[in-house]
């Protein structure tokens, strides 16, 4: 899911049809401009924030694009994202930010 300026602008894969509204965790990611990895959402007290994304997703990455946009990726097993995955998606976030800047998104 790509969320930009209060709107979900792209959904791919198996996600809920509900409108995703970012909560505290997503907002902290873009405020701090840091990737947040929830390796096992079963133990995360704020997991309800992601129910409208995809209920019971075992792991989640929140990747900031800029101060008003982020990428949300769900994994289908616990601890499924590697450091290489995180670096790869961070680079995609940088590319998306460049596209947003060029096109006044």
Model-predicted regions and their roles:
Residues 3-53, 58, 72:
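Regulatory sensory and allosteric helical modules in signal-transduction proteins
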Residues 81-101:
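Amphipathic alpha-helical "output/dimerization" segments
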Residues 70-80:
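Short beta-strand-to-loop transition segments that serve as allosteric relay/switch motifs
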Residues 56-66:
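Short hydrophobic beta-strand micro-motif common in sensory/regulatory domains
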Residues 52-57, 94, 99-105:
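Acidic/histidine-enriched, beta-strand-rich ligand/metal-binding domains
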Residues 65-69, 83:
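Extended amphipathic alpha-helical coiled-coil/heptad-repeat regions
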Residues 3-5, 66, 76-77:
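Short, flexible beta-strand-to-coil junctions
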